[in-house]
């Protein structure tokens, strides 16, 4: 039991919302219903799933698919993949930065580098970063230097935020030990 965090389910707010009304009885019903049914509204989830909720919007379903590849034979698989992503993405961002300085208005070159970075983002499910890469590529297609520069700054910012969030995520999983392994419950 200690390996599970408990998370209130959407059903709670949905059911309680059914009883909202203007008179006192609706308040009594709402409170009574919740008091008598709260145990049914809790869903056990693994620690990793619970922690991933903090990364919602930064990661998409692809990250969960990467997690599904992790097993007892390779217990650090996801962390290793993410480490490789940050190493590779750092190199690609350095290449983009150099290209922006060395080759002003070479939109094809910029776009090629950003396409590689976007592919890396897609492979681990880094959705916010991928979206900023797409914005950069759109600006390249429009020949918009300022748009490219703005988008690249956003890419760098999203990269830094994602790195910090994932480092915290893996640190918490390591502290929890094997019990916090990235497994999702069968529903």
From Swiss-Prot:
Keyword Nucleotide-binding in the entry? The reply is no
**Gene Ontology cellular-component terms listed:** cytoplasm; nucleus
HPt domain: residues covered: 74-169
From the record, what ranges are coiled-coil?
none
The record's GO molecular-function terms, alphabetically, read: histidine phosphotransfer kinase activity; protein histidine kinase binding
| Disulfide-linked positions | none
Would the keyword Coiled coil turn up in this protein's UniProt record?
Answer: no
Q: Which UniProt keywords apply?
A: Cytokinin signaling pathway, Two-component regulatory system
Which GO biological process annotations does it have? Answer: cytokinin-activated signaling pathway; phosphorelay signal transduction system
Pfam families listed in its UniProt record: Hpt
Q: By its UniProt entry, which InterPro entries does this protein fall under?
A: AHP1-5/YPD1, HPT_dom_sf, Sig_transdc_His_kin_Hpt_dom
Q: Which domain of life is it from?
A: Eukaryota
Protein purpose = Functions as a two-component phosphorelay mediator between cytokinin sensor histidine kinases and response regulators (B-type ARRs). Plays an important role in propagating cytokinin signal transduction.
Protein's UniProt name: Pseudo histidine-containing phosphotransfer protein 1
